[in-house]
Amino acid sequence: FALLGTHSTRLMLFECVDGGLLRPLDWGRTAYLPDDLSEILKYKGKTSAAFTHMMMNCARAASDFALADQPLTVLDPMCGKCTTGFVALQNGMNAVCLDIDRKDLKEAADYFSNYLQFHRLKHRLAQSSRTLQKTPVPIAEYTFSDTKEHFAADDVRTLMLAEGDSGLVG
């Protein structure tokens, strides 16, 4: 049931106690990163983060990986400004985001760098390039964690932003 509970938005959870009073219940932290990660960046044509979150949880629940202990990796071959990647990171997954539009990827990278700094999350950024079918593909790979302790213990997540044509992969 806990997995099904991730499909919806919940605002508060209470139990009824003596005299009809409501006592707030703690349902535990389910998000790896705060919900604002996929919500702050606004632009025309943006995919709904709430819809993406629901679809990602439906796909995971229907898969053989529903109860996997290790983080999954989500591939978004036409990421735009990375809404799907950011939702994956919120859910504690890794993300590989590919797009042909350099401007969109730069905006996503700048936003994520600022987000990590603002929230004081420990991270590393590695810039590299790979060649796919004789075409150079610039890559920015962020390695980060939700806490300093997890980062020190190498319990990290990654966001890989790659500029290129998804038709080259495969």
Cite the ranges covered by each PLM segment.
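Class I S-adenosyl-L-methionine-dependent methyltransferase catalytic core
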Residues: 1-10, 16-170
